[in-house]
C-alpha cells in the first residue's frame, strides 16, 4: 500500500509539471505581410526544440479560430478542409534542430486577408504563438508633380513632403532621384549619398525634413526632374516630382561696325545678346519707331549660336542704306531684347541709343564706277554697261573683307542682283544679303576702283576666316575701313575736289552677277566737278609738316651728339696740389708739468 501511494505522488508531480508547461503561453506578434491580389505567398514560423514537441498547427483568426492544419509527431498531418495537406502546409527540420512550419497560400484574393496564427505546443516550455497579419491590396503610388522656376547662381530648395494629405508613419524609407532625357540617377538613399556625378559635385546636400538643397543653380539643371520617393509599405508609396526651369538675364551690347560711311552709303549696326537662356527676341528702334521686319533701305539679319556653357548668343545686324536726300541726315538707333523670366516675368533689356549722321552721303551719280577687290586706280566713267547703284563717299573710307580676301582677289556674288528705282533706294534679290547685293550691283564685268588713292588699302581678316583667295561662287561681305577715294569724270579727281550734283533723266541699269544688264528708265543724278584754285591738297600739307618736324628733330639729335663727343674728348681741368701740412712736435719736460702759459699756447 505504501508503494502504491509513492507511485501516485510521483505521477501527480509529473502531471502538474506537464500541465504547468502547457498552460504557460508565449505570444509573439509577427510583422505585417503585404501581398498583391493573385500572387502567391508563404507564411513560415519556426521553433528550436529543447525537450519535447507535442504538436503544431495553423489557424485563421476570425470570430472563432478556424483550424487550417495540425501536425502531431506520432499521428502526422490533419487538415480541416477537404484538400490535400501537402499542398497547404509543410513541416521541415534543419540540421541545427530548428523546425519550420510553413503555410502555403496560392492565388490569394482580398478574402484571404486577415490574421493567421501559428501555434507550437512544447514541453515543458508551453504554447508558443506567432500571429501574422496578411494585407492583400493593389499597389498604389500617390504622385504629385511641381515646377520650380529660378534664376542662375541661386540656391534651390526642394521639399520632399509637400501638400501631403495622409499622415506619414514613423517607419518608412525614402530616396532622392534625378531624371533628364530619360536617364535616371539616384542621389540619396535613406540618408546615404550614393551619387558621385561630377555635375552635382559640391552643389547638392540633404537638409532638414529630407529637403534637397542645390546651390548654385546652373544652366545644365534646366529640365531636370528631382523626385522624392517615400515608401510607406511595399504596397503604398508617395512620389514628389519637381521639374526645374532655369532662366538667365541676358547682357546686351550694341556697336557700329563702320565708323565712317562706305562707298554705298551704308550704316551697319550690330546688336549682340550674350548669356541668353532661354531664347530671346531682338527688336530694333530707329528714331523712336519700332521696325517690323525689313523696310525700304533697311535690312535685318539674325543669327543664333549655342555656346558650350549652355547659354545662347544672339546677334542681329541692321543695315541702313541712305538712298536719297529725302531721308533725314541724322538717325538714332537702338536695340531691345525681350526675354522670359521666372513666374511669367519678362525682362526688357535695352542698349544705349547711337546717333549717326549721313551728311557725307552724296546722291547717286549718272556715271558710277565699278567696284572689285583689286587694286585702286584712276579710270574714267564709261557711258554703257555700268550699274548706277553705287554711292559716292567722303575721302576717308576703309574696306575690310570679312572673308579674308587679298587685294588681288576679285569678289563676286552668285545669283544676286541690285536695281534702283526712281534713283532713291536699292532693291536686293535672289537670296543674298543687302550688303553683298549692293556690292554685286556696283560691279561690272571688268574694272577696278576708279579713284586715285594716297595710301594702299588695308585688308583685315575677321576671326575664323581664311586668308586665301575667295572662291568665285562664294558671297563676299564688306566692312568699310581706311582708304582715300574720289570720283573722276573724264579726268582723275583729287580728294579735295568739289562735287555738285544735278538730276537728269538716264536709264537705270540692272547688273547681274554674270555681267548681263537690264535697263529701266528713271531719273539719275549727274556730277559737275570744280577744281580748286590753289591746287594744293591737305595730304600734301600734312606730309610737308611731318617732313619739316622730322628734319628739326634730326638736327637737334645731331647737335646733342656732337656736344657729348666734345665733352668726352676735352682734357680734364688743372688742379694745383694742396699745400703741405705742418706738424708741430711738443716735448714734455722731464720731472715737471707744463706751465699754465705753455698750456694756453698749445
Swiss-Prot record:
Stored SMART domains: IG
Polar residues bias (residue ranges): 409-433
Functional note: May be involved in adhesive interactions of activated T and NK cells during the late phase of the immune response. Promotes NK cell-target adhesion by interacting with PVR present on target cells. May function at a time after T and NK cells have penetrated the endothelium using integrins and selectins, when they are actively engaging diseased cells and moving within areas of inflammation.
Residue ranges constituting the Ig-like V-type domain according to the UniProt record: 24-134, 138-244
Glycosylation sites: 42, 100, 107, 145, 153, 163, 195-196, 258, 281, 306, 330, 348, 415, 436, 514
Complex formation: Homodimer; disulfide-linked. Interacts with PVR.
GO biological process, one term: negative regulation of type II interferon production
GO cellular component: cytoplasm; membrane
Extracellular side: 22-536
Subcellular location: Membrane
Limits of the Ig-like C2-type domain: 250-355
Membrane topology, as annotated: Single-pass type I membrane protein
Signal peptide extent: 1-21
Biased composition (Low complexity): 434-448
Keywords: Cell adhesion, Disulfide bond, Glycoprotein, Immunoglobulin domain, Membrane, Repeat, Signal, Transmembrane, Transmembrane helix
Spans annotated as Disordered: 402-478
Chief localisation class: membrane
Name recorded for this polypeptide: T-cell surface protein tactile
Cystine bridges: 45-118, 160-228, 271-335
Tagged with keyword Secreted: no
Membrane-spanning intervals of the chain: 537-557
Cytoplasmic compartment residues: 558-602
Gene field: Cd96
Amino acid at each position: 500500500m505504501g508503494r502504491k501511494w509513492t507511485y501516485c505522488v510521483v505521477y501527480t508531480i509529473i502531471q502538474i509539471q506537464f500541465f504547468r508547461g502547457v498552460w504557460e503561453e508565449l505570444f509573439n506578434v509577427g510583422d505585417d505581410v503585404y501581398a498583391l491580389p493573385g500572387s502567391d505567398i508563404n507564411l513560415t514560423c519556426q521553433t528550436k526544440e529543447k525537450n519535447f514537441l507535442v504538436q503544431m498547427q495553423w489557424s485563421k483568426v476570425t470570430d472563432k479560430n478556424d483550424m487550417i492544419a495540425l501536425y502531431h509527431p506520432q499521428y502526422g498531418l490533419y487538415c480541416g478542409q477537404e484538400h490535400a495537406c501537402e499542398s497547404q502546409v509543410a513541416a521541415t527540420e534543419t540540421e541545427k534542430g530548428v523546425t519550420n512550419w510553413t503555410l502555403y497560400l496560392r492565388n490569394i484574393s482580398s478574402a484571404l486577408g486577415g490574421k493567421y496564427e501559428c501555434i507550437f505546443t512544447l514541453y515543458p516550455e508551453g504554447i508558443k504563438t506567432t500571429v501574422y497579419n496578411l494585407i492583400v491590396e493593389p499597389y498604389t503610388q500617390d504622385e504629385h508633380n511641381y515646377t520650380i522656376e529660378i534664376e542662375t547662381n541661386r540656391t534651390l530648395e526642394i521639399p520632399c513632403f509637400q501638400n501631403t494629405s495622409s499622415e506619414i508613419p514613423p517607419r518608412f524609407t525614402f530616396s532622392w532621384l534625378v531624371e533628364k532625357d530619360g536617364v535616371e540617377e539616384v542621389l540619396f538613399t535613406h540618408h546615404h549619398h550614393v551619387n558621385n556625378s561630377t555635375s552635382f559635385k559640391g552643389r547638392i546636400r540633404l537638409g532638414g525634413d529630407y529637403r534637397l538643397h542645390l546651390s548654385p543653380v546652373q544652366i545644365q539643371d534646366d529640365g531636370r526632374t528631382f523626385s522624392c520617393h517615400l515608401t510607406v509599405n511595399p504596397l503604398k508609396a508617395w512620389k514628389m516630382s519637381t521639374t526645374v526651369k532655369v532662366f538667365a538675364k541676358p547682357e546686351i551690347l550694341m556697336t557700329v561696325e563702320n565708323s565712317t560711311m562706305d562707298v554705298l552709303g551704308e550704316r551697319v549696326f550690330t546688336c549682340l545678346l550674350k548669356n541668353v537662356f532661354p531664347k530671346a527676341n531682338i527688336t530694333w528702334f530707329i528714331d523712336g519707331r519700332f521696325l517690323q521686319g525689313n523696310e525700304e533701305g533697311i535690312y535685318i539679319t539674325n543669327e543664333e549660336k549655342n555656346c558650350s556653357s549652355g547659354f545662347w548668343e544672339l546677334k542681329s545686324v541692321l543695315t541702313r542704306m541712305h538712298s536719297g536726300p529725302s531721308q533725314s541726315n541724322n538717325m538714332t538707333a537702338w536695340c531691345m531684347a525681350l526675354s522670359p523670366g521666372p513666374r511669367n516675368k519678362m525682362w526688357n533689356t535695352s542698349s544705349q541709343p547711337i546717333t549717326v549722321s549721313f551728311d557725307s552721303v552724296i546722291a547717286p551719280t549718272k556715271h558710277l564706277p565699278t567696284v572689285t577687290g583689286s587694286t585702286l586706280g584712276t579710270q574714267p566713267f564709261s557711258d554703257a554697261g555700268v550699274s548706277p547703284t553705287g554711292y559716292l563717299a567722303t575721302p576717308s573710307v576703309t574696306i575690310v573683307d570679312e572673308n579674308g580676301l587679298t587685294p588681288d582677289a576679285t569678289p563676286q556674288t552668285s545669283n544676286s542682283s541690285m536695281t534702283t528705282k526712281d534713283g532713291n533706294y536699292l532693291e536686293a534679290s535672289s537670296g543674298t544679303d543687302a550688303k553683298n547685293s549692293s556690292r554685286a550691283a556696283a560691279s561690272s564685268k571688268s574694272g577696278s576702283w576708279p579713284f586715285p588713292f594716297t595710301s594702299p588699302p588695308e585688308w583685315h581678316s575677321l576671326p575664323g576666316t581664311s586668308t586665301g583667295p575667295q572662291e568665285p561662287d562664294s558671297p563676299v561681305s564688306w566692312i568699310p575701313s581706311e582708304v582715300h577715294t574720289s570720283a573722276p569724270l573724264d579726268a582723275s579727281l583729287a580728294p579735295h575736289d568739289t562735287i555738285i550734283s544735278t538730276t537728269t533723266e538716264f536709264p537705270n541699269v540692272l547688273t547681274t552677277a554674270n555681267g548681263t544688264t537690264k535697263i529701266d528708265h528713271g531719273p539719275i543724278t549727274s556730277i559737275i566737278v570744280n577744281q580748286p584754285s590753289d591746287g594744293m591738297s591737305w595730304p600734301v600739307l600734312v606730309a610737308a609738316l611731318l617732313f619739316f618736324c622730322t628734319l628739326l628733330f634730326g638736327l637737334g639729335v645731331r647737335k646733342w651728339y656732337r656736344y657729348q663727343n666734345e665733352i668726352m674728348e676735352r682734357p680734364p681741368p688743372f688742379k694745383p696740389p694742396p699745400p703741405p701740412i705742418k706738424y708741430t712736435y711738443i716735448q714734455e719736460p722731464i720731472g715737471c708739468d707744463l706751465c699754465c702759459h705753455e698750456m694756453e699756447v698749445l
